From Swiss-Prot:
There is a cross-link at A130-G132 (5-imidazolinone (Ala-Gly)). Homotetramer; dimer of dimers. Belongs to the TAL/TAM family. Gene3D superfamilies: Fumarase/aspartase (Central domain) (1.20.200.10), Fumarase/aspartase (N-terminal domain) (1.10.275.10). GO terms for molecular function: ammonia-lyase activity; L-tyrosine 2,3-aminomutase activity; tyrosine ammonia-lyase activity. It comes from Myxococcus fulvus. This is Tyrosine 2,3-aminomutase. The keyword Isomerase applies.
Length: 526
């Protein structure tokens, strides 16, 4: 099972029968301990700073239901369905480990909701990221007790209305079940998993745009040679250099370094004096440094995938139920610092792709440095026609906005809960910002690739490499040569629609042979 397939592809989930028996055994063990009054957090105590309040067994369901209702305190806009599905998928997987005390019936009901497209309404704001994602997961769990609201087929309705139509029965929770549902990192991890998937696609698009612009600008092939890049020792740099060679193979537009040297020699061979030429031995950084810039982006994504995948497959509850009350682990597995820091790293990597794309766009448009292309790629009479001048404003403004979004969240802890939660991760904030960055950089790359498609009309289009010609062909169908005859926003939206939807994902994957694990995989067994 992989998160993206369930969240975006709407693939259903099926719970492993053998693992459910382990879940049941742990659940029954906790119910017995609760009746025997073994002191255990969330079983017979209050929550958070109220841990010193002991709750007798007759209030077991009240305690759990009160937790869900009181902590369903989220605010802001609700998450879209695909993020909600990712959250539900990760929470089911974590609870299927069998260390939380949840009942199989609760997991089956969550899975049924997921498979039938019944999505809890989960507000985006309200999580501190430790003790897990209490607010969003409380909203996720409310429908299990017949409370809250759900969204089905895009319509938000009270839970019980939908349950009655679907023949579903809400549950009465036992000892610790409410706490098991909400005391974990599954909201930030679900959101982070989607951000990671989108970031990987943006990296492929960044490579395609980079391979396009070096041809449009007749850049040198030398910066992408294996020998020089391998000496830097970073594997990501070597991979990106190889991909740049692959994506530009067969081009008739780039310049060989030996040819550049020869041209300089011929230009200066008859003079022994200082002489300024119009020939540049090296290109500007935005045409030369892709292996170094995108190489570290690649390695950052790989590191973040490890953190996020490990968290998605972890036991992130508290307490963690072991064989006896004495062994049961009262700790802090709910803390989201791994995911929070992974998202901060990921947000910087995504923002850097936006920085590169914005600078490449400027080099493509600036009439002082983009020769022989027309200024701002105007189709005729530059000045009367503006070309992509307006599109650049959008890209530049978003790149600036991204600098704020890329600031770390994981170090911005504010104590809460009577000083009990005195160092928290803010992991869901970090994940939300990373999702926003992915949207923003997708727009910057859409402007750049629309401009590159325009630039191909002013160059020898047949001399581009095969992968880039296929991109131009695809984009040309929705965004033909721009002649100021329609709003620029329409062009950008059309290109964005191609690049960032499923057809764009498939095309980029087919063209960019990037060895990334394709999915964030889940394993319900411990």
């Amino acid at each position: 099972m992989d998160i993206y397939a369930v969240a975006v592809g709407r693939v259903g989930v099926e719970l492993d029968a053998a693992q459910l028996e382990r879940v049941r055994a742990t659940h029954l063990r906790v119910q017995g301990w609760g009746m025997e009054k073994y002191p255990m957090y969330g079983v017979n105590t209050g929550f958070g700073e109220l841990i010193n309040v002991i709750i007798p067994p007759q209030f077991k369901s009240d305690l759990q239901h009160n937790l869900l209702r009181s902590h369903a305190a989220g605010g802001g806009e609700p998450f879209p369905d695909e993020v909600v599905r990712a959250i539900m998928t990760v929470r089911i997987n974590c609870l299927m480990k069998g260390y939380s005390g949840i009942s199989p019936e609760a997991l089956q009901l969550l899975a049924t909701m997921l498979n039938r497209g019944i999505h809890p309404v989960i507000p985006m704001q309200g999580s501190l990221g430790a003790s897990g994602d209490l607010a969003p997961l409380s909203h996720m769990a409310l429908p299990l007790i017949g409370d809250g609201h759900v969204r089905k087929n895009g319509v938000t309705r009270p839970t019980m209305e939908v349950f009655q139509e679907e023949g579903l029965t809400p549950l009465k929770l036992g000892f610790k079940e409410g706490l098991a549902l909400v005391n974990g990192t599954s909201a930030m991890t679900g959101a982070a998993s989607l951000a990671l998937y989108r970031a990987r696609h943006l990296l492929r698009l960044s490579l395609l745009a980079s391979a396009d612009i070096v041809q449009a600008m007749n850049a040198s092939t030398r910066p992408f040679s294996h020998t020089g890049n391998a000496l830097k020792n970073h594997p990501g740099q070597v991979v990106i250099a190889r991909l740049m060679r692959d994506l530009t193979q067969g081009t008739g537009l780039m310049r060989d370094h030996q040819d550049i040297m020869r041209a300089i020699s011929e230009r200066t061979s008859h003079s022994n004096d200082v002489e300024e030429t119009e020939i540049y031995l090296q290109n500007a950084y935005s045409l030369r440094c892709m292996p170094q810039v995108l190489g570290v982006v690649l390695e950052t994504l790989q590191m973040c995938q490890r953190f996020i995948e490990e968290e998605a497959n972890s036991v992130n509850d508290n307490p963690v139920i072991l064989d006896t009350p004495a062994e049961t682990y009262h700790g802090a597995n709910f803390h989201g610092q791994y995911v929070a820091m992974a998202c901060d790293y990921l947000s910087i990597a995504v923002a850097e792709m936006g920085v590169l794309a914005e600078r490449q766009l400027n080099r493509l448009l600036d009439p002082h440095i983009n020769k022989p292309l027309p200024g701002f790629l105007a189709h005729a009479k530059t000045g009367l026609f503006c070309g992509f001048e307006g599109g650049q404003y959008l890209a530049t403004s978003i790149a600036s906005e991204n600098l704020d979004l890329a600031a770390p969240s994981s170090i911005k802890s504010i104590p809460s809960n009577g000083q009990n939660q005195d160092i928290v991760s803010m992991g869901l904030i970090a994940a939300r910002k990373t999702l926003a960055l992915c949207e923003n950089v997708g727009t910057i790359l859409s402007v750049l690739m629309a401009a590159l498609n325009q630039a191909s009309h002013f160059t020898e289009a047949a001399k581009y490499s095969a992968p880039i010609r296929s991109i131009h062909e695809k984009l040309g169908k929705v965004a033909p040569r721009y002649e100021d005859e329609r709003p620029m926003s329409t062009v950008i939206a059309q290109v964005r629609g191609v690049l960032l939807q499923e057809q764009g994902l498939a095309l980029a994957q087919s063209l960019v042979n990037l060895d990334l694990t394709p999915d964030l995989s889940l394993e319900p067994r411990a």
